[in-house]
Amino acid sequence: MQGKTVVVTGAFGTLGRAVAGLAAAKGAKVAMLDVAVRPDNPVRDAIALAVDLTKLDATTEAMRKVREATGRIDAVLNIAGGFVWQTVAEGDEAAWERMFALNLKTAYNTSRAALPHLIETSGAIVNVGANAALNAGAGMGAYAASKAGVHRLTESLAQEMKGRVRVNAVLPSIIDTAPNRADMPKADFSTWVKAEDLAKVMLFLASDDARDVTGVLLPVMGRV
């Protein structure tokens, strides 16, 4: 990753911080995009931008700023997203709209906005799907459906950009985060996917070592 520019969305969450920190440690210039910029930035000299990724115009402008500041964009890691547990019978339409906006629309907007820059560098996109989108449990409908959309976006865009931009996705089970621990206090946290380990997989897919890998939906299950 030495000398490359890596854009991380959802960059101030647990996984985003892990990815941004590891990318910087590998020598990349890092741009951290999130709905709000926090003062406790884990990456010195990172470009930090507050942007509403559900808005294509705002996302396009953010990519322009990154390209202008660094001279290139080599990889985009789409981590921005959200989760809700809600049954169809007792839930509401707003939750479905929110999941599709946070999980699928952000991935689409970021990918579309970055494509002109990624084509210049023969770059890579790495999305975050979900194992739950392969086999959804009760209450997971809105979340799983939106993540299934991320899977199909990944596959379709990989075909469209074949030979120009690589597009892959990781499909984690449960990521070990403070909110997940709070929501599932009786679970065995030791079986969950560590953010640092998932970051390594994502940065491999973004790197030249994965130059022949595109259109892949890669499960990262931990020991769940």
Question: Which residue stretches match the model-derived regions?
Answer:
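Active-site-adjacent segment of SDR/Rossmann-fold oxidoreductases
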Residues: N135, S156-V165
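Conserved glycine-rich cofactor-binding loop
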Residues: F12
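Active-site helix of classical SDR
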Residues: S111, S146
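Substrate-binding pocket helix/loop in short-chain dehydrogenase/reductase
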Residues: T87-V88, D92-F100
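Residue(s) in the substrate-gating loop at a strand-loop-helix junction
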Residues: A130
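C-terminal helical subdomain
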Residues: G163, A169-V170, T177, K186-V224
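Conserved NAD(P)H cofactor-binding loop of Rossmann-fold oxidoreductase domains
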Residues: I79-W85
